Amino acid sequence: MLARPGYASEQALLDAAERLLVEAGAAGITTRRVAEEAGSNHGLVHYYFGSIEQLLVRVLDRFTERLIERQRQMYGADVPFLERWRTAMCYLDEDRAYQKIWFELQSLSWNRPELREHLAQVHGDWQQVLMEAFAPVRDRLGIEMPLDALVTLVYTFNEGVMLERLCGIETGHHELLEWIERWLQQREEAV
């Protein structure tokens, strides 16, 4: 199947916006800068995306789709949960570009209700991935916490770690992750 006309230009703009979001942040992005980075005409940003904000939303959505697919495959793997947990925690280091994009758009959404609604949908997609991953584990390990509460705990824990790491703060992270791993290991052994 052939790509639709303009697909390569559109992808180049998305790639450029992704790089700029990571390197310069949302405040450093202009239509002209994205177009220049993509080797394209700045009018194409508006043609394909309507606005710079919509371009940034598409960057987030494209990145999110890739990572959610990866997470679902990882959580669906036939390996002990502790191995899946370790892999997920390694992703905290590997996914810093996505994390920066996520927090850049979160900060933009504080004053843009339409963007806030979209980010709430993305948040819901991530929560669904965690619900699917943790429901059988919670029951098997006898974790007496409502599933919604467990997922919220894990999600906000991850966001806190990500935000601190983006700020250059890693104090206590290694120790906390080791403690959680030991706790999970003890739960696994007790089953």
Task: Describe the function of each predicted region.
Residues T87-D93, K100-R112, W183:
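Helix-loop "lid/cap" segments that line or gate small-molecule binding pockets
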Residues D61-R66:
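Short, basic, alpha-helical segments at the C-terminal edge of helix-turn-helix-like DNA-binding modules
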Residues I68, Q73, E94-F103, P113-D139, ...:
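Amphipathic alpha-helical packing segments from all-alpha helical-bundle domains
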Residues M1-A8, V191:
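N-terminal intrinsically disordered/low-complexity leader segments
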Residues R116-A120, V137-V191:
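Hydrophobic/aromatic-rich alpha-helical bundle segments in the mid-to-C-terminal region
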Residues G39, G50-Q54, G76-V79, D93, ...:
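Residues in soluble alpha-helical coiled-coils and helical-bundle/repeat scaffolds
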Residues S9-A12, A16-Q54, R58:
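Helix-turn-helix
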Residues R58, E69-Q99, L147-V154:
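Hydrophobic alpha-helical connector segments
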